[in-house]
From Swiss-Prot, chains A, B:
Belongs to the metallo-dependent hydrolases superfamily. DHOase family. Class I DHOase subfamily. It catalyses: (S)-dihydroorotate + H2O = N-carbamoyl-L-aspartate + H(+). GO terms for cellular component: cytoplasm. GO terms for molecular function: allantoinase activity; dihydroorotase activity; zinc ion binding. GO terms for biological process: 'de novo' UMP biosynthetic process; purine nucleobase catabolic process. It comes from Bacillus subtilis (strain 168). Catalyzes the reversible cyclization of carbamoyl aspartate to dihydroorotate. Its EC number is 3.5.2.3. Homodimer. This is Dihydroorotase. Pathway: Pyrimidine metabolism; UMP biosynthesis via de novo pathway; (S)-dihydroorotate from bicarbonate: step 3/3. The keyword Metal-binding applies. NCBIfam families: PRK09357.1-2, pyrC_multi.
Amino acid sequence: MSYLIKNGWILNENGEKTQADIRVTGETITAIGKLDATDNETVIDAKGLLVSPGFVDLHVHFREPGGEKKETIETGAKAAARGGYTTVAAMPNTRPVPDTKEQMEWVQNRIKETSCVRVLPYASITIRQIGDEMTNFEALKEAGAFAFTDDGVGIQTAGMMYEAMKRAAAIDKAIVAHCEDNSLIYGGSVHEGTFSKANGLNGIPSVCESVHIARDVLLAEAANCHYHVCHISTKESVRVVRDAKKAGIRVTAEVSPHHLLLCDEDIPGLDTNYKMNPPLRSPEDRAALIEGLLDGTIDFIATDHAPHTEEEKNTEMKLAPFGIVGLETAFPLLYTHFVKNGSWSLKQLIDYMTIKPCEAFGLPYGTLQTGQAADITLIDLEKEAVIDKETFLSKGKNTPFNGISCTGWPVATIAAGKLAYEEGRLVK
Amino acid sequence: MSYLIKNGWILNENGEKTQADIRVTGETITAIGKLDATDNETVIDAKGLLVSPGFVDLHVHFREPGGEKKETIETGAKAAARGGYTTVAAMPNTRPVPDTKEQMEWVQNRIKETSCVRVLPYASITIRQIGDEMTNFEALKEAGAFAFTDDGVGIQTAGMMYEAMKRAAAIDKAIVAHCEDNSLIYGGSVHEGTFSKANGLNGIPSVCESVHIARDVLLAEAANCHYHVCHISTKESVRVVRDAKKAGIRVTAEVSPHHLLLCDEDIPGLDTNYKMNPPLRSPEDRAALIEGLLDGTIDFIATDHAPHTEEEKNTEMKLAPFGIVGLETAFPLLYTHFVKNGSWSLKQLIDYMTIKPCEAFGLPYGTLQTGQAADITLIDLEKEAVIDKETFLSKGKNTPFNGISCTGWPVATIAAGKLAYEEGRLVK
């Protein structure tokens, strides 16, 4: 299949708008510039649209196997494509956990069979993510594991994390950490702060996260391992990562859209669509996250897309599962809040969602270049619409942003040269 | 009892030698200047001697109760006085541990009955220092606990340390931490480095210490607790403390003479007198400790005086207990190495052993001032002698410095107005 994306504009190195047509042949970009259509290619009229590299989200939960009621690889991938994502990395906290070569191969096949975007599967660090016994890293790497993580739970002992880091470093893979010290959770369902006190809820103190990061950056230094911090959420964590980077430690970090956009004081009431892990923190934490993203302490944005059924979320704050969806709302929310109404440049936002995650993990995606994978997202920056969870292609409707009006929506997504999503008005 | 210390010289604010006589009446200094003897006072001729504030060592092991073969409060105090120390803080890893009001009162009485210097007893953080259950901080404070520590073992769970810090902060006491993650000890008896590899010994990696400090400074920040790091030994630990101080966290740290003087490459062979915990680290670690002391990251020097019987130490490296004595060798070694043959000023060294520990813990000692406690040490900076463990007043002879020639020896010590030690040629 061959496409010619005509009349759109791209952002150049300096973030300036530049008119450019893009030719896609098979899975790759084969030409960029002023191009005329050839016979056997489908023209996509991108007039007035931003032609962006496909977004990259290195933290999604597709729930398959075992949680198909919440999401499947197929529905998750469709949601990603609709959100403009062409590459996602799927967390291993499924049932079963991909902690063996066979399990990983099953997931890979499932991706091949059902996914419309590139899905990079994480393998778990420990068997069944219980934290006691390490998985076979070498075998899992061979089976295509993207990196290793027990996301959803923290690695509780330093010794286990240190051994995992040494093993990961030996096979040039990253350790990706959900940072949570179980002895500091206190049965909390929200951040230990204004909201928890006002509502008589147990709160999860910021140290629950920051102490693991502080531990792990030292272990990563000693093991010379690439250590990546999932969903960073506290100002102290940002400081620890900043100091670690200053010391030359190979640490990267991601932040979620919801932690950039909301803090605990924004939680309107006991609405479980505002319950995620880590929780929404204080205004000072949110400010520190934004500052950390802007000064490079935090490397990129990742949604931590975590679908649950409405039934699961339809209970009290203490009992509801943690997590919200994010793939289909990330760009509109972030563009509206930080670019259109904020101080970020468009390029900054695009980079946080494309090239930055790829640079952090050495992935050959996230840019528009001849010869590179044809991962392309067309964005209508003028389009205004209200977030409507009923239109989500994700099975998960658990979002706190339902009803919010946003500007700037992805309207078509080409993943590895295939049209993965399109609002039905572009392709001729 | 009243003393007049005549003809000695003291160091003024700028570290300059100044002739000054000092009158001691009862427990306090009552006059400093050009003084003439009165009838009923004993004159101590301090001609040619440095008259220093008494040294303060906030980390000693006096082994009583339960370890009287190694040391008693009495013998330890005598060793302290001989080393020029007038105040010491005694660690609670005795048998039994002072983890109740009654035990603490027993120790206090023992100190009153047998000690010739001021001994401030630590109480333990957890019952029997096992790490599971917190002691009654309020009761132990009432019984005179100086601060709280489980020295000898690390507090393994963040939750326990956090609760302890909150409790200590509430009663304005410090948490003093032996930083050691049990999951990172690997059965090591020396530092994981050159010496361990050359001798086929399990090594204790630096992260074993540094990860606890990194955890604890964040907990201390959240709990607003004074957190003190015992016997800091690694370059990463110095960096973590430096960053924490920069962030305004109430952390202080001590370093031992042996970690300033020796590294693992100095260990001549399988000599258990070079075995202590934390172990002697790399040359780079030693350099970082010196730098950290000089730039204020590390607050003061403490010996971690840890006597063992010669029988206990007379075994293989793996089996011997950790620890060396230090009270009777600290000043001569440090003065010789860092002042006489080094770049430190005399005042720097004296401050690290007197006012700095007192400032860190708010103790009213460590200076020569009218009205202050008469804690005074006379030092012959010209005296040259060889360290001879057989002359030690400590029961412990376990030192790696035996036979080393040093210059600069304490020759008399007045503790709270009483002559606690004197070489027999001064008092008239």
